[in-house]
Amino acid sequence: MSYQITVADTDITFPCEAAQTVLDAAETAGWSIPYSCRKGVCTTCAGGLRTGELTVRGNDTVRGPQHDVLLCQAVPCTDVEITPKRIASRRPPVRKTITATVYRIRRPTRRITLLDLRFPIGLRAPFRAGQYLTVLLPDGDSRLYSMANSPQHNDGAQLHVRTEPGGRFSDTTLATLATGDTLTVELPYGEFSLDPDSDEPVIFLATGTGFAPIKSIIEDQIARRSDRTIHLYWGARDEADLYWGDLAAHWARQQPWFRFTPVLSRPTRTWNGATGWVQHAVLHDHPDLRGRQVYACGSQQMTTEALTHFTSTAELTEDRFHSDAFVPSGDPVAPPSATARPSSMEQT
């Protein structure tokens, strides 16, 4: 049995098979709805249910009208009418499962590892700047990491991994990983990408390894000879946590359209740059965010607070806020009322 999915206030309809989620059905039909973790944690895919009934995994049946239904977890019980944040016709890159070889391991800080992977000779995996891959572990578990390389270099992948004590991958597998070892990865996933049809100024916010997908996007913009205005705010505890701050500073010197503002929450006395929380630094410089697109990647606290502050005090509409919130593996499925935002998930 299949049900009909209708997108409210549009002429878009598509079928959804029994036990298929709304997100999966949309992708099968050639439509793209924002998502990230696909596990019901990040809420990137949250949308409204205007009419009909859905079963949300881990929750009871939901009847319209409802807000913030996790479409990656929602299975129709009837024909339904939905109101996703965004929906677009898009032909995504073909997803591939690849045995990748560890090419290089660098540790710019005690807790950050830059992991360069290479794919078999002649094999490329096209992706959009800002997307992520899944590392498939031998027991069937998985971890998600943003790709920091640009799409022009799609014969491998660069991952920025923050070590978390007790982390299944970051603190266990990574500790013994050596050059020449292999990892099985699947890619690409995610919707944390610039809209190619827009030329509006962009503000990026990053905390920690949230810099990874932004690096991919900016290097893609450089390769495409774009002149779209971009301002990156990268928040960290101290200068050491800005593990590739010299690269961002180099972009700022070389590209007239790019600005870089590092923000430290625990600065030393010699620091003369921005201090505090990265979202507050943005508001200090841009009290009015109308006419801009905002992309936030990093801790869930930062992305959630940025959305709240920007929409309530800086005139930013929610459809212009895009986020990728890193959340630990194993978090429980968020209830439909959760307000936390997106996630290309740095996992442990």
Identify the meaning behind each predicted range.
Residues 1-80, 229, 233-348:
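Reductase modules of NAD(P)H-dependent flavoproteins
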Residues 50-53, 85-87, 138, 188:
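Short, surface-exposed secondary-structure boundary micro-motifs
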Residues 69-92, 181-183:
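Short, structured interface segments
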Residues 89-93, 141-148, 169, 190-197, ...:
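Short, Lys/Arg- and Gly-enriched loop/turn segments at beta-strand edges
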Residues 94-182, 236-238, 263-266:
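Ferredoxin-reductase
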Residues 130, 210, 299:
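Short, conserved phosphate/pyrophosphate- and ester-handling motifs at nucleotide-, phospho-/glycolipid
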Residues 181-192, 281:
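Helix-loop module immediately N-terminal to the HCX5R catalytic loop
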